[in-house]
């Protein structure tokens, strides 16, 4: 198994409950294939660098994963098929840090609340 970091952007009009359902669907795929979610972070509703479709903002979500390449391909296939996900990127990593990501560190200096950070070791 290999480490992967995946970030996906969900449409701005999707509720937090629906975002949780999307992440739970991905978690089920990962666990059913003997993978592990090492870290997950909700980065909040952020302004996009450029408009994507009718979206000027998006909900950003990060997953740190320990999975096989086949599971990565299945996750990316599901992300492509999900109409609520407007962009995603998954890269292979050497390791997954247990520290909060730099984006969350920057958010803590702002007035934006952090809704979900989970680290599994």
UniProtKB/Swiss-Prot annotation:
Q: Which domain of life is it from?
A: Bacteria
Q: Which CDD domains match?
A: bS6
Any one biological process term the GO annotation gives: translation
In Swiss-Prot or TrEMBL terms, this protein is called Small ribosomal subunit protein bS6
Respond yes or no to whether keyword tRNA processing is given for this record.
no
GO MF term (any one): structural constituent of ribosome
Query: Which Gene Ontology cellular component annotation is one that this UniProt entry carries?
Result: cytoplasm
Q: Which gene encodes it?
A: rpsF
Keyword rRNA-binding belongs to the record: yes
Record's keyword terms, sorted? Ribonucleoprotein, Ribosomal protein, RNA-binding, rRNA-binding
* Residues spanning the signal sequence: none
Per the record, the similarity remark reads: Belongs to the bacterial ribosomal protein bS6 family.
**Gene3D superfamilies, per database record:** 3.30.70.60
Q: What cystine pairs are annotated?
A: none
Which InterPro entries is this protein grouped with? Ribosomal_bS6, Ribosomal_bS6_sf, Ribosomal_S6_plastid/chlpt, Transl_elong_EF1B/ribsomal_bS6
Protein role: Binds together with bS18 to 16S ribosomal RNA.
